[in-house]
Amino acid sequence: MQVVAFTGAGISKESGIDTFQDRPGIRDKLTRTFATNHPEEYRKVMKEFCDTIKGKEPNNAHKELARAGVKIITMNVDGLHEKAGSYDVLAIHGRLPEEHELPYCESLRNAPVLYEDKAPRYQDAFDIVYGL
């Protein structure tokens, strides 16, 4: 039997990463329109987001999924599944920008996937589920 875990912000909350519900207004700043029209403020938001996640460690849930070797489909961009040792992770909303990408992060695609952008990994997630 194949097991797939679907995870989102809740799994990383115990690691000290707030959910979007804990950060009112953040969704409005994670749109392609905002990134294009307000690139400096968008860069600031992304830097703050990256700084918040920097130094965070996987919690027991991340570690147990890694230990069990469970395939993971996650909406998170924090990389904690990979940091816990999971090797089969599909991050459907992409990743955070690397430090050297922050000065031009408004032009990146899938780092992370922004609201209004096509999420290119959704079909991969559907394929995994349909293959169960």
Name the predicted role of every residue range.
Residues 1-132:
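Conserved catalytic core of sirtuin-type NAD+-dependent deacylases
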